[in-house]
């Protein structure tokens, strides 16, 4: 039986080789782009899958060698598709192995493309669409095996005015590094790009290179990343959907661990670990394993993995994460719909990635970073949708806070230094999202902080926050001054975080941005140590005598040091910025006003 099977296998392979040579000859005579060649490549992939279990290890290696040769013959012909549009396919060339690359003629044109794309697009055009990148998976990951019946995945890329070579490298990379039986389709969602080459050239290339595999969805108007991803979800047909920025490259073996974890629990959202593609040289750099967190402004950031993961000592183990950075995530398609997708009432992008993390955890699901599944990502210096992106990030953050954060929503308003009533931001109608939370029977945000994100600092004892002005100089606000300095100053009021002042029930008067998490320094305390006329800013825990950091303050009244009885006041000085200096001295009746008072329930 084994001999007969071997004969049948080799006969099949030789027939395929013969057919490939014949088709290649026909191609040369007709000088066209034969669709038969494309079908042979697809057939070759199916043959690989069908015969993966046939014969001994030696048989399989021999078969794969013959198939590799056939694929090389066909691939060399298809490589011609990239040349007419000025791009490079196949092995070799600049940047192989994820190494840094440069161009000798990197000049004014490259500078213009930097401004347009936020990365070196001219260099990207010279790097192969099929380049290899380093395998940064932990060693244990490479020894793992997975079930044969994993679900298929639809991979969705969102782009707007991206460089064509970067988009196509993302597509090539996912096709090259995903087993054919697992990759159902690739969906490109064009969020109404202006770039002409992203129309005809892109269509023609993917239709010839990947017929039936790659679909393009085009938005008739600019929707923003959030709603563009929803369009990709609607177009997807596989049981699992992976959402990615269109400027990524996939590591070998990225799909199997992600699909395996979702197969175990469909309520689990998996985040491939992120490595970096340097925007200037396209060097692929390894990032340390990290969870994804955020500050009280709901801006995402990398954070240290949970202590239980560190104690485990297994770099291949999944990392519990409170939220996601947002450039890549994989999710069961039906489950994503069940929990409400991304909030369609949010605009452009920013905050939706944090909101999804809160919602998944509070509503019975989970989210994890998977070190065995890795994707390299370009951190661009310039991003699309740049106009008013801070406004949209603020708007989306307030929307998430109103739905999911209960009384802790005050922290988001504090972080943005805006009032809770009439904040000057219309975050839209959230009634449908509140109904979703009720329908899903979700837990409280307090539960989430205690069980998922205990690293967050809470400021429940805050009585009042915002800009603080003196009656003697009402156009100027208390300001933390230089970040690394120890002197509070008066500065023209601008409402940003350096002028965020918080007064707590304990009597602390703190200046500067919220520390948010245990990984970040907290805002400093205003201190009167009694030794001079100038108040200082110190880390609250470093103040020698606790009373030196305590103040009495009432609206439209003085600010009085509990340690010395002196008042914080303003004096005119030719030597000070804007002619105004902060001092502590005998009280003269000066009054201070702070912008926002809150009533905070104890938790």
Swiss-Prot record:
It is found in: Golgi apparatus membrane. It catalyses: L-seryl-[protein] + UDP-N-acetyl-alpha-D-galactosamine = a 3-O-[N-acetyl-alpha-D-galactosaminyl]-L-seryl-[protein] + UDP + H(+); L-threonyl-[protein] + UDP-N-acetyl-alpha-D-galactosamine = a 3-O-[N-acetyl-alpha-D-galactosaminyl]-L-threonyl-[protein] + UDP + H(+). Disulfide bonds join 141-372, 363-442, 477-493, 525-540, 567-587. Keywords: Disulfide bond, Glycoprotein, Glycosyltransferase, Golgi apparatus, Lectin, Manganese, Membrane, Metal-binding, Signal-anchor, Transferase, Transmembrane, Transmembrane helix. It comes from the Eukaryota. Its EC number is 2.4.1.41. PROSITE patterns: RICIN_B_LECTIN (PS50231). GO terms for cellular component: Golgi apparatus; Golgi membrane. Glycans are attached at residue 460. Residues 318-380 are annotated as: Catalytic subdomain B. GO terms for biological process: O-glycan processing; protein O-linked glycosylation. Its main location: Golgi. The chain crosses the membrane at residues 7-29. There are two conserved domains in the glycosyltransferase region: the N-terminal domain (domain A, also called GT1 motif), which is probably involved in manganese coordination and substrate binding and the C-terminal domain (domain B, also called Gal/GalNAc-T motif), which is probably involved in catalytic reaction and UDP-Gal binding. The ricin B-type lectin domain binds to GalNAc and contributes to the glycopeptide specificity. Residues 30-603 are lumenal. Residues 150-261 are annotated as: Catalytic subdomain A. Specifically expressed in brain. Not expressed in heart, placenta, lung, liver, skeletal muscle, kidney, pancreas, spleen, thymus, prostate, testis, ovary, small intestine, colon and leukocyte. In brain, it is expressed in cerebellum, frontal lobe, temporal lobe, putamen and spinal cord, weakly expressed in cerebral cortex. Not expressed in medulla and occipital pole. This is Polypeptide N-acetylgalactosaminyltransferase 9. It holds the Pfam family Glycos_transf_2. The gene is GALNT9. Its cofactor is Mn(2+).
